[in-house]
Amino acid sequence: MYDLLKTIDDPADLRRLDRRQLQPLADELRAFVLDSVSQTGGHLSSNLGTVELTIALHYVFDTPRDRIVWDVGHQTYPHKILTGRRDQMSTLRQLGGISGFPKRDESPYDTFGTAHSSTSISAALGMAIGSKLRGDDRFAIAVIGDGAMTAGMAFEAMNNAGVEDDVPLLVILNDNDMSISPPVGALNRHLARLMSGRFYAAARAGVERVLRHAPPVLDLARKLEEHAKGMIVPATLFEEFGFNYIGPIDGHDLDSLIPTLQNIKELRGPQFLHVVTKKGQGYKLAEADPVLYHGPGKFNPAEGIKPSTTPAKKTYTQVFGEWLCDAAELDSRVVGITPAMREGSGMVEFEKRFPDRYYDVGIAEQHAVTFAGGLATEGMKPVVAIYSTFLQRGYDQLIHDVALQNLPVVFAIDRAGLVGADGATHAGAYDLAFMRCIPNMTIMAASDENECRQMLYTALQQPNPTAVRYPRGAGTGVATVKQMAALPLGKGEVRRQSTQPAGKRIAILAFGTMVAPSLAAAEQLDATVANMRFVKPIDAALVRELAETHDAVVTVEEGCVMGGAGSACVEAMMESGVIRPVLQLGLPDRFIDHGDPAKLLASCGLDAAGIAKSIRERFVEHASGKSVKRVA
């Protein structure tokens, strides 16, 4: 099994194969991807769709000397397998294992780290120009999906690249949202070879040189060429950016891909190759439902993904989706917005029930935020459902277009804190720090499912921009209450009171997901625990009260310590003039790698045992009979 694949330890081995061996290799590679992902979990549909394209790129180009930048990067499993990581696939996305995305420190073939979309063309252009300035003759190739092409950054890069006449740049559009019928496919195969050939490029350049002295004739010739191409292929847009458009061609046909790429390799100037692929290619279940098989957990490939038979705790994403539908039922002004994350953000049911108030704006976070601001000016109640890591991309719009004008936009921030297998690129570590410094913002962190529901309702009542953050995955098992009531603004609650005498009293101020482990740690330490609820406005009165009545204060948050919720507590103490020793616990000042979420939290000292251990190490353990060390 995998006889050919076992002989490939790097692309040099691949390039030694006879062309006739490549399709059997592709079949083995596709089977290996399916087998691997079924055992580890991970992205499947997208990787099954890039097998032939990956083989063709490494076969034609001299990688890693020639650079390949994979946009988003979740489709790079075939690339990883062919570049020396075949035997490490069993560790995929696990603690200490290989990443599910390209990482520069993992392999020289991972030339640029990706995970957020639409960055590849900018990076590849920088590489291509850098290569040209150094006098190196190497290609830079950006592989970008049709979804990622909706983002403005991709077009900004193309606009920049189009004026570089001799830059060795190739942009490959991996279009998996359309299909080509066999007759059109045959025609386009011939056309792609023609358009990528040196004769076509030379003839085109020669005609332009001759006609440059007759601008009206040159303009007419260009229009005729665009019209001729436009009748067969959607070339005009990319040609307008200054690219030579080639395609579309079948991205699963090595007999089309390889000759076309070989022709392109002889050209200079920005080239644009349009390939058509199918998500889930070669695995019927994934072809039929690529969304279900986008990022599955472990499953049996012979049976496919089966619904769980054990009752599962409701996820925070489900809580949000149910709340949004309930809110829209009660108020016709509620509008739901997602930047291309309908399923991930829990908005499938909302789209079905309220299609006129559902807006998927594509991978366009900046637009999503400002679009919501515009809706708010017209009396609507926009709710932007967005992952914490992706809100970073709309930060200027959050400040300039929403907060500065004090517009009532609700931000439902999913995937706050650590996200597990997706790793550092998707971690929601920074939202508390980057939002709490913005005037007019209200920020809440949910500690359980019902509190999340009530916070979302509270946010909808506010006259200013308001954010509710909640984590990925299942909640604590708390039932949600159908009736919704607004929480007192800027007020926390004490969940546990210490019975320790003066001199040994410790107060833990916990935020969001850290309330539960803080309560568990407090049982070991007999500490007071407050569920702070609001990061902004911070409950300054509660902070002062707890500081006055306790000998030390501990803040705990699932976010970066610097500038986060703990900093807000320290600022409140300083302002009140009540100074106590403070221990701030949160995510450390480093990027947290991929792995099991519980293990990652434990490694950061943010599980119950870690919180208790940190408190004991920072302050004198109660069992010693001594008082808390007054270390400022």
UniProtKB/Swiss-Prot annotation:
One of its GO terms (molecular function) is 1-deoxy-D-xylulose-5-phosphate synthase activity. GO terms for biological process: 1-deoxy-D-xylulose 5-phosphate biosynthetic process; isopentenyl diphosphate biosynthetic process, methylerythritol 4-phosphate pathway; terpenoid biosynthetic process; thiamine biosynthetic process. Thiamine diphosphate binds at H74, A115, H116, S117, G147, A148, N176, Y283, E365. Binds 1 Mg(2+) ion per subunit. It catalyses: D-glyceraldehyde 3-phosphate + pyruvate + H(+) = 1-deoxy-D-xylulose 5-phosphate + CO2. InterPro entries: Dxylulose-5-P_synthase, THDP-binding, Transketo_C/PFOR_II, Transketolase-like_Pyr-bd, Transketolase_BS, Transketolase_C, Transketolase_CS. Mg(2+) binds at D146, N176. Keywords: Isoprene biosynthesis, Magnesium, Metal-binding, Thiamine biosynthesis, Thiamine pyrophosphate, Transferase. It comes from the Bacteria. Gene3D superfamilies: 3.40.50.920, 3.40.50.970. It is an enzyme of class 2 (transferase). One of its GO terms (cellular component) is cytosol. Pathway: Metabolic intermediate biosynthesis; 1-deoxy-D-xylulose 5-phosphate biosynthesis; 1-deoxy-D-xylulose 5-phosphate from D-glyceraldehyde 3-phosphate and pyruvate: step 1/1. Disulfide bonds: none annotated. The keyword Transferase applies. Its cofactor is Mg(2+); thiamine diphosphate. Its EC number is 2.2.1.7. Catalyzes the acyloin condensation reaction between C atoms 2 and 3 of pyruvate and glyceraldehyde 3-phosphate to yield 1-deoxy-D-xylulose-5-phosphate (DXP). Homodimer. Belongs to the transketolase family. DXPS subfamily. This is 1-deoxy-D-xylulose-5-phosphate synthase. It comes from Paraburkholderia phymatum (strain DSM 17167 / CIP 108236 / LMG 21445 / STM815). The gene is dxs.
